[in-house]
Amino acid sequence: MQVSVENTTALERRMTIAVPAERVEKEVEKRLQQTARRAKVAGFRPGKVPMSVIRQRFEGDARQEVFGDLVQASFYEAVVEQKLNPAGAPAVEPKSFEKGKDLEFVAIFEVFPEFTVAGFESINVERLSAEVADADLDNMLEVLRKQNTRFEAVERAAANDDQVNIDFVGKIDGEAFAGGSAKGTQLVLGSGRMIPGFEDGLVGAKAGEERVVNVTFPEDYQNLDLAGKAAEFTITVNSVSAPVLPELNEAFFAQFGIKESSLEGFRAEVRKNMERELRQAIKTKVKNQVMDGLLAANPIEVPKALLENEVNRLRVQAVQQFGGNIKPEQLPAELFEEQAKRRVVLGLIVAEVVKQFELKPDEAEVRKVIEEMASAYQEPEQVVAWYYKNDQQLNEVRSVVLEEQVVDTVLQKATVTDKSVSYEEAVKPAQAPAAAE
């Protein structure tokens, strides 16, 4: 078999392959012999059809099958021989497939980039440390209470944090507009749910009162037909209800699946969850900085096939997340290209770090991660057992642990600055990660 390779771009290869005619004809003859044993031809018993008839009737189909099989087989033989690592299926251009002649074709494909991960010393990481203080715990308990607020009707003027039940009709230039009217809407004043000025205009209103509120839609309002326009809302207040926070008692604790009858026990469980959240937040921020540093220090070209595959995966995820009412291909690829490129580049870099440093998942750490996740459930032992009975889920955890080992490896070589901060600052969401160049 003759093989020649042309580098058309940094990653694209144009490989010409010639399969000897002898091999082609041998495969064609083999197919015809197989066909002869099972072919049904009028006037002949099965297995007794003359080869001349078999060739006349079936040789064309046999050659097409052989062409497809030999193209696939010889392509993979050639990439192994040439020590190439294809990043996707090739585009095939037939050149010659005549009887008695060599099978010749061109395969055009991309290869994975070859590189060594470098620049570890140029990476700067700020590693946060924090504790869950009693004040943080108190604040969290108040958040949990507010999340379970109920409202009771009152006969007084509405104030911020009250819930009002309203009917309203909105008009622009004296004309009602689509989406500008509703009946029986529940609205918590001060929640910021409505456009600026709407909720403020209801502060001080009582049940049965009608108010006219003038507002202006923001310039960046999602409905461009309304953006920047002045509107008048006629609003009828049907009822006013005041917020009532639940007491910290056994019934409240049970809503969170916590079998504790004492406030001390509940606080201990909440603190445990907050500490778990804190550890994960700190770990995530360190990881994001490491990954950003690796991206900046190792600009690499991405195979188009990998980028397209990742874009398609993100499209499918987006459709599933938002209800699946559209087809993935209806979403513009441009929406996902930046995120897809970051994922692909980081995937290549992380895989290369694993290879360079001969990393393997630490099974003790895998167990620790599973137990940490399981501790959030009521029956943690069952959750741990479930992971170890499901190879796919277990391998996903191993991948997470391996990625953490990559981060630890980089941290040993990077410049790391430790910083003590408050719990609130530590768990605050980080800025969006940098895109791959």
Curated annotation (Swiss-Prot):
Gene Ontology CC entries for this record: cytoplasm
Keyword set, alphabetical order: Cell cycle, Cell division, Chaperone, Cytoplasm, Isomerase, Rotamase
One Gene Ontology MF term: protein folding chaperone
Pfam families with a match to the protein in the record: FKBP_C (PF00254), Trigger_C (PF05698), Trigger_N (PF05697)
Domain PPIase FKBP-type: 161-246
Comment on protein domains: Consists of 3 domains; the N-terminus binds the ribosome, the middle domain has PPIase activity, while the C-terminus has intrinsic chaperone activity on its own.
Protein name: Trigger factor
Organism of origin: Pseudomonas entomophila (strain L48)
